[in-house]
Amino acid sequence: MKRGSFLVLAAVLMVFAYLVYYSFSSPYTVTSDDAKRLLREKKVDVVLDVRTKMEYNLGHYPEALHIPTANLAYTAETLIPNKKTSILVYCNTGQRARYATELLVAKGYTNVKYIAGSYLTLTR
C-alpha cells in the first residue's frame, strides 16, 4: 500500500510540475520586471486586462483596456484594429492572459506578450 501511495503521489507531483512549467514557458511570456521595462520605455501601445468586470473594478493597471477573456474572440478586432499594435496582456495568475495571447496571435496579432503572474507585480 505504501508503494502504491508513493507512486500516485509521485505521478501527481510530476503532472503538477509539468503544468507549472507549461504555464510559464511560452515565447510570449514576459516577467513583471520585463513588463515594467517595456512600459517605462513606452514600447507598449495597449495594456490589456482580460479579467472579469468584478476583478477589474476591484483594481487595475491605469489606462488598461478591459476586455474579459470571454468577450475577446469577438471584440478584439473592433477595439484593437491594428494587428501590429504592441499589446501587453495581464490577469490575476497568467492563465487567462496566456489564453488571450494565444487567441490574439491566432487572429493575426504580431506583437503580443503576457505577464506570467499577477498584474499586481506591475504596481510594486
Question: In which residue ranges do the predicted regions lie?
Answer:
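Extracytoplasmic/periplasmic/luminal assembly and interaction segments
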Residues: 53-93
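Flexible, polar/low-complexity N-terminal or interdomain linker segments that lie immediately upstream
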Residues: 1-46, 50-58
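Extracytoplasmic/secreted envelope proteins and their assembly/folding machinery
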Residues: 32, 36, 69, 73, ...
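Conserved beta-strand scaffold positions in the cores of enzyme catalytic domains, especially
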Residues: 47, 64-66, 112-114
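Catalytic cysteine-centered active loop of the rhodanese-like fold, especially the PTP/DSP P-loop
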Residues: 76-123
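Structural motif
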Residues: 39-40, 56-59, 79, 104-107
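A broad detector of short, well-ordered amphipathic alpha-helices
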Residues: 33, 62, 95-98
